């Protein structure tokens, strides 16, 4: 029978405990300070037009309101005001954003048109997470003279397929690994035959962060595993001293 030295057993036990700690502890990714983004329109290149970058664009920090009165670019046309606003408070770890336009028309291709009213995307975030909403008061997408009515105040991630045009998501919402919430009031993805372009109306992003000076909370699972590791180390040390 081969006898393993006591010191070897202690070191092996500590290594095993450390391995369990590293493998079982979940990975965390979080913002260190709050952030927010808002814009009213953006589009990939389509209809022989260049891509439309996000506009008007507001980001926090530093935050503030950006406004365009009237717009004719790419597939978009309106004489209404487009307004994007962001704000935040690092002391509280909060952020907010909004993107609005009262009326907007879309030209997505030959005999492909759209009309939207009352577009509003909003979000807010704090250290515990983010919430948001993206709505329209009314909307239609018309293909070869045949209109498809878009739902007003749609539940999040409402999907609509428009024959001859593509897919539309109303009140589109997603959250990334940093708990940053993204909301699109209207997101159109054209058919591949039409170029597969993305067209977005009403976009906001919000991410919260720990309040300034706050002590980060330790995840319960990490706490349990960490406590077990500490206990194992203490017991191993006692055992080793007893055998020495």
Regions found by a protein language model. Give the residues of each.
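Extended, solvent-exposed, non-transmembrane regions
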Residues: 3, 9, 22, 26-241
């Amino acid at each position: 029978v081969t006898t393993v030295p006591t010191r070897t057993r202690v070191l092996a036990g500590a290594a095993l405990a450390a391995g369990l700690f590293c493998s079982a502890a979940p990975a965390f990714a979080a913002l260190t300070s709050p952030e927010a983004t808002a814009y009213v329109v953006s589009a990939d290149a389509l209809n022989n037009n260049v891509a439309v970058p996000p506009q008007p664009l507001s980001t926090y920090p530093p935050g503030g309101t950006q406004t365009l009165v009237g717009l004719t670019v790419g597939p978009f046309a309106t004489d209404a005001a487009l307004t994007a606003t962001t704000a935040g408070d690092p002391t509280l770890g909060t952020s907010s954003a909004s993107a609005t336009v009262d009326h907007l028309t879309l030209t997505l291709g030959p005999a492909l048109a759209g009309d939207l009213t009352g577009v509003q995307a909003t979000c807010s975030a704090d250290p515990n997470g983010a919430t948001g909403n993206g709505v329209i008061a009314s909307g239609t997408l018309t293909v070869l003279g045949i209109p498809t009515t878009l739902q007003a105040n749609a539940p999040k991630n409402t999907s609509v397929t428009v024959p001859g045009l593509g897919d539309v998501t109303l009140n589109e919402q997603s959250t990334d690994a940093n708990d940053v919430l993204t909301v699109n009031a209207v997101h159109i993805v054209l058919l591949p035959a039409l170029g597969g372009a993305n067209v977005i109306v009403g976009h906001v992003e919000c991410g919260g962060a720990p309040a300034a000076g706050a002590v980060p909370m330790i995840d319960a699972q990490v706490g349990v595993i960490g406590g077990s590791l500490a206990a194992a180390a203490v017991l191993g040390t006692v055992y080793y001293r007893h055998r020495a």
